[in-house]
Amino acid sequence: MEQLPSNLQVLLQAAEYVERREREAEHGYASILPCDPATPGRRKRQRTNSNPDNVRSVHNELEKHRRAQLRRCLEQLKQQVPLSMENSRHTTLSLLHRAKQHIKKLEDQELRAKSLKEKLRADQQKLRQRLKRLLPPNTERIRTDSLDSSNLSSERSDSDQEDLEVDVEGIILSGNEGELFVSFSAGLEHSYSTPAHAWL
């Protein structure tokens, strides 16, 4: 009979122990499992504790890269946007404001250039139609052919004359050849049939 109460007492103590451990686990005071440094739970906590440092370092590197890229873009923008000489130091806000004004100015210039181009194209078309009405049908073709042939002949004669001038001017005379050229220009008689006398 004494064994039964002892068994009940052991069961009650075990139940109280389990309840106490569960309450401590709910409030975060202790863990249900024993605290062993080699357990996977401890290693998992160590990894979770080190993860914020890794995330912070990655975030810092990305932020550093973003700022460097932003500085490069601002330097390129500063070279393309005309800045006033009033202040040697320009803030990012003033640079962006001037870039916006410069873009608006370029857009206005592009619109004016397009409208002028369309106007000139329309004027050119009107002039072509007027010229076509004023001239007979075959006159323009004959005139074009004559101009092309005259230009071609004049270009050929000019090129031939230039070749002759280059050939004459490009001669470099030595001592004997210079005397021969002077004697020939003075009117002395030289015969090509006796080349031995010509080179004396």
From Swiss-Prot:
A Gene Ontology BP annotation from the UniProt entry: regulation of transcription by RNA polymerase II
Gene3D superfamilies tied to this protein: Helix-loop-helix DNA-binding domain
Pfam families, per database record: HLH
Presence of keyword Metal-binding: no
Region entry Disordered, spans: 31-56, 133-164
Domain (bHLH) ranges: 54-106
GO cellular component: nucleus
Compartment(s): Nucleus
Tissue: Expressed broadly throughout the CNS and the eye, starting at neurula stages.
Record GO terms (molecular function): DNA-binding transcription factor activity, RNA polymerase II-specific; protein dimerization activity; RNA polymerase II cis-regulatory region sequence-specific DNA binding
SMART domains: HLH
Keywords: DNA-binding, Nucleus, Repressor, Transcription, Transcription regulation
Xref: SUPFAM superfamilies: HLH, helix-loop-helix DNA-binding domain (SSF47459)
Complex and partners: Efficient DNA binding requires dimerization with another bHLH protein. Binds DNA as a heterodimer with MAX.
Function: Transcriptional repressor. Binds with MAX to form a sequence-specific DNA-binding protein complex which recognizes the core sequence 5'-CAC[GA]TG-3'.
Protein name per the record: Max dimerization protein 3
Chain's gene name: mxd3
